[in-house]
Amino acid sequence: MLENAFIMLAIIFSVNVIYVSLMTVRMILTLKGRTYIAAFVSMFEIVIYVVGLGLVLDNLDQIQNLVAYAIGFGTGLVIGAKIEEKLALGYITVNVVSANPDLKFTQRLREKGYGVTSWSSYGREGDRLSVQILTPRKYELRLYETIQEIDPKAFIISYEPKRIHGGFWVKQVRKGKLMNPKKKKNTNTVESENEQK
């Protein structure tokens, strides 16, 4: 009897972890505009939800089942968030302000395959170089490391753009083929492609 009770708790906990993980991922996919994938995930999500809820409702007199359900819910949220971090869907825009306008910031970032826009700006203590970079979220940490290598004192702020329209990278972004900074094309190849256009 006790063994069956533990099995029931484990099933309720596991079902809810899976359900909430899928729910979290589905919500994030929806927010990122991946509607069809989100709809596909939701089919599995609702089946698991009904099974888990049914197990709890059939045994409402057992408080431990409700506790397992609640703990599974919280655990599922954490796991869902971790899955989203690993998937790193979408893009980020990083704005960088360097106190040293003479640094070859733009050139070095472009050599690594990033889409870069730069302009001269003026801060409290004089001239600045402002740089805006668009990159897939999965390359975010690598970009920060590159920026720190170029200018350890650079001011960095990042945000997630809601819409991307126009500009050099739009076709690649729409196809999900924004260049991987790790696998940068050979400069000669890029130049020859530009000449052909």
Swiss-Prot record:
What InterPro entries does the database record attribute to this sequence? DUF2179 (IPR019264), DUF5698 (IPR044035), UPF0316 (IPR022930)
| Gene Ontology cellular-component annotations | plasma membrane
Q: What Pfam family does this protein match (any one)?
A: DUF2179
Q: How does it sit in the membrane?
A: Multi-pass membrane protein
**Would you say which domain of life the source belongs to?**
Bacteria
- Keyword Transmembrane (UniProt): yes
Q: What is its main location?
A: membrane
Cell compartments where the protein resides: Cell membrane
Give the residue spans that cross the bilayer: 5-25, 37-57, 63-83
Tell me the keywords, alphabetical order: Cell membrane, Membrane, Transmembrane, Transmembrane helix
Q: Which family does it belong to?
A: Belongs to the UPF0316 family.
Question: What PANTHER family does this protein's entry cite?
Answer: UPF0316 PROTEIN YEBE (PTHR40060:SF1)
| Name of the protein in question | UPF0316 protein OB0738
Source organism per entry reads Oceanobacillus iheyensis (strain DSM 14371 / CIP 107618 / JCM 11309 / KCTC 3954 / HTE831)
